[in-house]
């Protein structure tokens, strides 16, 4: 077995050597063939490369365009589904908002209806009750009538009291005048001025003078002299409410209180003496404003009208200025109302004499010493 394997190995080596010898013999031919083949291939290599590049670019372009179409188709589908989802979601929101709005409108309408019914019931029952208002107005009218009647009665009573007071005052004045004119009373020798023989009945003043008592002048002057020293003269300057006003009472004859007391007149004079402010206190605080107002008032008194240039202003161009008849004429202002109040036309005079001013005589003075009753008798 070992011999066979060795023989096979030798044969194989021989074959390899024979093959190598053949290849070595054909080496120059292979080189020339390789050269010519590569030279022929180089002449077509650029054309084939350009063709291959063109084929590859076209193929790749087809692939890219197909992929872009696929992407566009897929993106369109995705956008369609997404937009439909957003549309459905927005539509659901709109529908929900519309539903809530419809419910709120319905609820508001129902609430308004309920409030209207309730407010109407409440107003009719508590605020504007027709029967209650009718009764109230009837009571008010009755109260007004009663108050009006009471006021009318009170006004009549006040009027009667005022008339009574006026009559009493007039009677007192007449009595006082009669006491003052008591010396005009008729005597046995000389008749008074109120006793005329030409009258059927005597003058009422004659009877009043007879009933009146003469006024005591000496006593009055003495009382007046006494009162001049009293605090009434300096109390006259005080206000009405500063010292109590009361009717005069008769003096009380009593002794002066013992002790170091001042005279009551002196005390009252010191208490109720008028205020004597200084110049600073007497001057008002708003004297500037008062001075301005006084100055404006003087200016208004001087001016004939507030708008001085009213007839010549452009604002009143459309209005026609109408001058006064008595203060304007063709040339000069008329003197009527300024110098005289009677028209003078010498051509219409009947005579050259002016009007004669004659005053009527007093009948009472003209009858002095002529028409009196004899011996003071009342006719």
UniProtKB/Swiss-Prot annotation:
Q: Which keywords annotate this record?
A: Calmodulin-binding, Cytoplasm, Repeat
Residue limits of the IQ domain? Answer: 48-77, 71-100, 107-136
Give the source's domain of life in one word.
Eukaryota
Q: Where in the cell is it found?
A: Cytoplasm
Primary localization class, coarse: cytoplasm
GO CC entries: cytoplasm
Molecular function, one GO term = calmodulin binding
The record, for PROSITE patterns, names: IQ
Which tissues and organs express this gene's product? Strongly expressed in adult testis but weakly expressed in the spleen and thymus. Strongly expressed in round and elongating spermatids, and weakly or not expressed in spermatozoa.
Q: What is this protein called?
A: Spermatogenesis-associated protein 17
What is the originating organism of this protein?
Mus musculus (Mouse)
